Amino acid sequence: MAIRNNYSPCQRTRKQRTILQEGLVDDMRNRFDAQLAQLNLELIEMGTLCEDAIKETYKVLLNEDKEAAKEIIAHDSVIDRAERDIENLCLKLLLQQQPVAKDLRQVSAALKMITDMERIGDQAADIAEIVATAHIPVADEMVTLKEMAEATMNMVTSAVDAYVKRDLDIAQKVIAADDTVDELFIKMKKKLLDIIQKNPADG
């Protein structure tokens, strides 16, 4: 005996529409998650570029390598391009997906991060330009500078790691590390001021 379908045509239409809408929502969520995963990958890549810029800038200062300094200046355009690519992806996520709450905070945080990382590239290029055009005497102060460079590289790595993993503990360590870098900066500045005062002609 055939089983009668008790749904009216209108009810069946509503049910089909609901199924289609749920499928559309799932598809949009999957696409959004895929784009977020891509965002994470691109942030990791940009973080690596910034770490390399810091490391190479320290080497350039240590060795007064003018040719390597020119490479760092050129490398800044790669970091700038990475920033633009990530910014475009974030804008696409905001316009197409219209994220709210946690998702919106995630995209907004990425936009803030790339601004700060792009600034690292700019600073590295600025230092490289100085090395390429002037004599920077190598002294004991380079030890402090090396500590600053290593601490800053670790901060970049940990900050991106905290973002990707959503790890509050790592984020707190990054905040604490900033105090260490600030202390090294003050120490370095005092040493440089002492040198200038003792050798005003060189300053």
Residue spans for each PLM region:
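Compositionally biased, intrinsically disordered low-complexity regions used as flexible
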Residues: 1-7
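Cytosolic, long alpha-helical scaffolding segments
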Residues: 7, 19-203
